[in-house]
């Protein structure tokens, strides 16, 4: 049957990538259809019940700054919040939250069902409709044909997914759900370059069977026994408009236990039946979230590993033991769980398993995540070789935006590595590809001092507003914050403190020593031991500003002060990094000719020519980041392009040098 209504964008898959893609495309005014195998699993957290972390929290904040759903859904469902790296610099601080799975799903579904211009439909997709080299729709398993101008594939682990428990294995997209075998076969027919990856999940435990007295309690921030008592963090920049931490449901602690030598002996006894070691699993697993058997094998000298016991939600006793992801046979899982302190009588509710699945080489994508071979077909999420909810959500928003922009006839949105972690993620994928599931870290961003969690809105919300992603409510909150930060920064720079008018004892109290000469408040705030609150208390509060008070700004006051303080204390570093950004931008403006025959660039080594021919970078900057391409090779390529006088290149080069 040909469905009578046509759409602009079809999104296939309703996990973290698909939901953000569909919401973004609809917010940009495109008629959007979200196809899913089950409406009951919209936004499902397939593995751990948490959002955020180092690098990952930065992506969540960026999705939020662009009007995405993940951060607000986490605030509405989060049962524990923590700021990681709190004692370190602002560039690497990150928010992490435990979420109630059911509340999170409900929050996502509510947003999907209430988004204008977005339709939901429950059916698996088995085929894509093509006209020449362009996708024009999707076909479901019962033959319903949906037509559209763009299709975004966010199939997660469902493409030819196979679950492994010991020597047993069966086809599945995740536990209890069928894999997308037909769609995977269709993509292989299109000769898109692909491979196999794997991920895994631990056995789930009934919390009533755990002896919590034998475990170490780990309270969240703001909880009794945690840091910042009474001040629970929030994820979304909009949370302040909805009551801040009052949005959160009841807060719960996590708990910690440990593996031991007996645990490790049990695990080793199952190596001969582990699909990892018998060769049953072809896919490569995530380096930074290894299975427990992989940890015991690789780190044989370690006698113990931490295991975090994380509650799955308020309405269930189910517990997620973070740290023992495994595909070992169930009898080994049973023994290894019961070998740990507090878990001696643990009842396993669900066995752990590994799942391997198809992914497609992201180097075959254009900069906007459109496939090079099929026009109008976009990929996002684990299909691109990434791991993690946050990486998926960010890619989904990016692909959904660019699919919608293409339908509108607008230029693609391509954030740079200096603008967003999303830009780093996209650039890493399309230039370097993946050999293992890709996970975001702050260390991947060379300009991370500019790409902090706290300023994601200052970097991206105006961009989102121009595209149409950001609604009036978010824009009003952002504008108040932005304007207050600008006003207060200028006031601090323009307000001077004269030592003749300040008693030495008062100067010593706030500044640590008497002032030698006149300083602006901004200069004083740059000192390591001076904070904003202390500075505003100087001389009886003489220099405090009502505009930045909690009475004036409400809950926004804290984030405004944070921005002002970071701008002052890191001014020198930020300016230096801006210079690095400007130097790096030179190569990013030099677009390589689409039809350039690298085989004719004889000054390059054969290897370099082969690598560039395979990758087809779009700019000289992208080319410089490809593995195996040296600075010398870039210089030789630049000389070739100059001598060849390629159309558009010389003018761009001249502009860049001017």
Swiss-Prot record:
<protein>
    <recommendedName>
        <fullName>tRNA uridine 5-carboxymethylaminomethyl modification enzyme MnmG</fullName>
    </recommendedName>
</protein>
<dbReference type="GO" id="GO:0050660">
    <property type="term" value="F:flavin adenine dinucleotide binding"/>
</dbReference>
<feature type="binding site">
    <location>
        <begin position="285"/>
        <end position="299"/>
    </location>
    <ligand>
        <name>NAD(+)</name>
    </ligand>
</feature>
<dbReference type="InterPro" id="IPR049312">
    <property type="entry name" value="GIDA_C_N"/>
</dbReference>
<dbReference type="InterPro" id="IPR047001">
    <property type="entry name" value="MnmG_C_subdom"/>
</dbReference>
<dbReference type="GO" id="GO:0005829">
    <property type="term" value="C:cytosol"/>
</dbReference>
<dbReference type="InterPro" id="IPR040131">
    <property type="entry name" value="MnmG_N"/>
</dbReference>
<keyword id="KW-0285">Flavoprotein</keyword>
<feature type="binding site">
    <location>
        <begin position="13"/>
        <end position="18"/>
    </location>
    <ligand>
        <name>FAD</name>
    </ligand>
</feature>
<comment type="subunit">
    <text>Homodimer. Heterotetramer of two MnmE and two MnmG subunits.</text>
</comment>
<keyword id="KW-0819">tRNA processing</keyword>
<dbReference type="InterPro" id="IPR020595">
    <property type="entry name" value="MnmG-rel_CS"/>
</dbReference>
<keyword id="KW-0963">Cytoplasm</keyword>
<dbReference type="InterPro" id="IPR036188">
    <property type="entry name" value="FAD/NAD-bd_sf"/>
</dbReference>
<keyword id="KW-0274">FAD</keyword>
<dbReference type="GO" id="GO:0002098">
    <property type="term" value="P:tRNA wobble uridine modification"/>
</dbReference>
<keyword id="KW-0520">NAD</keyword>
<dbReference type="InterPro" id="IPR026904">
    <property type="entry name" value="MnmG_C"/>
</dbReference>
<dbReference type="Pfam" id="PF21680">
    <property type="entry name" value="GIDA_C_1st"/>
</dbReference>
<dbReference type="GO" id="GO:0030488">
    <property type="term" value="P:tRNA methylation"/>
</dbReference>
<dbReference type="InterPro" id="IPR044920">
    <property type="entry name" value="MnmG_C_subdom_sf"/>
</dbReference>
<dbReference type="InterPro" id="IPR002218">
    <property type="entry name" value="MnmG-rel"/>
</dbReference>
<comment type="similarity">
    <text>Belongs to the MnmG family.</text>
</comment>
<dbReference type="InterPro" id="IPR004416">
    <property type="entry name" value="MnmG"/>
</dbReference>
<dbReference type="Pfam" id="PF13932">
    <property type="entry name" value="SAM_GIDA_C"/>
</dbReference>
<dbReference type="Pfam" id="PF01134">
    <property type="entry name" value="GIDA"/>
</dbReference>
<comment type="function">
    <text>NAD-binding protein involved in the addition of a carboxymethylaminomethyl (cmnm) group at the wobble position (U34) of certain tRNAs, forming tRNA-cmnm(5)s(2)U34.</text>
</comment>
